[in-house]
């Protein structure tokens, strides 16, 4: 009857389910060279705030919503306290980033509190950061589909993992409660995987 047919169809579907996606679409992955071009474009246009903000996100792995935690006090301490869903995690800030943050804050006459502010003294919104980054695409020669704040976090994750090979530590740094989430951040287009296969030299 209908029920047995439905069960067979479900079983077939279960057998045919495609393995979890392992590689990322080429049009979505931002690489280090493209990131550098975005920074250069921002600086050549005199957009120092945007260039520094991108460096801050990409060198720490913070979420764009956590940029408000980058305060003068955090830069002086070398770490920021980030609160999310009742949990607080400590984000270490590279010494070079701290120096740049403090120098920028000084030029903006910001003695304390948030460093990245609008001209009216308000914190930058996610939408504003997104739009400002998109504005760099043409000059930087980077596809628009690759340029959005969260992709800087993905670039940080891949760089951190290549250096440490410690996915548990990376999950802590990113503030992930599940390593499965962290695995998504480490997906690449597959080009690196292909190079590794070639280096194995197992085809004579």
Regions found by a protein language model. Give the residues of each.
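Flexible interdomain linker/hinge and immediately adjacent N-terminus
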Residues: 2-37, 84-86, 119-122
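Basic, Lys/Arg- and aromatic-enriched nucleic-acid-binding interface segment
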Residues: 30-64
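Conserved tyrosine-mediated DNA breakage-rejoining catalytic core shared by Y-recombinases
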Residues: 34, 60, 65-103
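Short, leucine-enriched amphipathic alpha-helices that occur as contiguous helical runs
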Residues: 35, 49-51, 126, 130, ...
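C-terminal catalytic core of tyrosine-transesterase DNA break-rejoin enzymes
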Residues: 55, 59, 153-177
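Short, polar N-cap/turn motifs at the start of nucleic acid-interacting alpha helices
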Residues: 75-77, 146, 166-186, 191
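C-terminal catalytic core of Y-nucleophile DNA break-rejoin enzymes
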Residues: 85-103, 113-134
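DNA/chromatin major-groove-contacting recognition/catalytic segments
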Residues: 188-204
């Amino acid at each position: 009857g209908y029920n047995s047919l439905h069960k067979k169809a479900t079983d077939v579907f279960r057998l045919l389910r495609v393995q979890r996606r392992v590689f990322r679409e080429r049009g979505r992955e931002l690489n280090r060279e493209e990131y550098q071009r975005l920074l250069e474009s921002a600086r050549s246009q005199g957009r120092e705030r945007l260039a520094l903000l991108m460096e801050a996100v990409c060198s720490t792995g913070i979420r764009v919503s956590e940029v408000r935690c980058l305060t003068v006090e955090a830069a002086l301490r070398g770490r920021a306290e980030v609160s999310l869903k009742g949990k607080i995690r400590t984000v270490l800030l590279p010494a070079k980033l701290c120096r740049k943050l403090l120098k920028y804050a000084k030029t903006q006459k910001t003695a304390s509190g948030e460093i990245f502010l609008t001209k009216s003294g308000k914190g930058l919104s996610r939408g504003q950061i997104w739009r400002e980054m998109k504005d760099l695409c043409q000059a930087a020669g980077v596809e628009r589909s690759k340029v959005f704040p969260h992709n800087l976090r993905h670039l940080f994750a891949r760089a951190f993992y290549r250096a440490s090979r410690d996915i548990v530590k990376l999950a802590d740094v990113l503030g992930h409660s599940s390593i499965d989430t962290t695995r998504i951040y480490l997906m690449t287009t597959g080009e690196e995987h292909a190079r590794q296969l070639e280096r194995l030299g197992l085809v004579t």
